[in-house]
């Protein structure tokens, strides 16, 4: 993923109040610091890690309030809304990242004719 491929798409989310998820460069940098890679963060959330879900949500909200803590964000999540939050995180991440165009392994060589 090239930095210029990141799309800043805001996804509305209802938590303690109406907010927006935004995975911008700063959010991705925070996730890289916490997990080593965005893939690791997403895989942990998909595996059901509440800590990963909380951290992803926190990173997506930092654009609104840089002083927001993970514990404060955790208080916005409940058992009744966690699934919807995970769906919205997935939607926001998908919107922010470029479409996968395949890897070099899957590329077809041009016909030399």
Task: Please name every model-derived segment.
Residues 19-21:
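Short, isolated positions in well-ordered beta-strands
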């Amino acid at each position: 993923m090239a930095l210029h491929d990141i799309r800043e798409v805001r996804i509305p989310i209802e938590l303690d109040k109406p907010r927006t998820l935004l995975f911008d460069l700063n959010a991705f940098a925070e996730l890289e610091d916490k997990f080593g890679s965005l893939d690791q963060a997403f895989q942990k959330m998909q595996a059901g890690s509440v800590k990963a879900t909380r951290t992803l949500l926190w990173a997506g909200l930092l654009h609104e309030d840089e002083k927001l803590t993970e514990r404060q964000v955790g208080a916005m999540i409940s058992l009744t809304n966690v699934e919807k939050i995970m769906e919205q995180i997935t939607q926001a991440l998908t919107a922010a990242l470029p479409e996968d165009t395949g890897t070099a392994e899957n590329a077809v060589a041009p016909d030399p004719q």
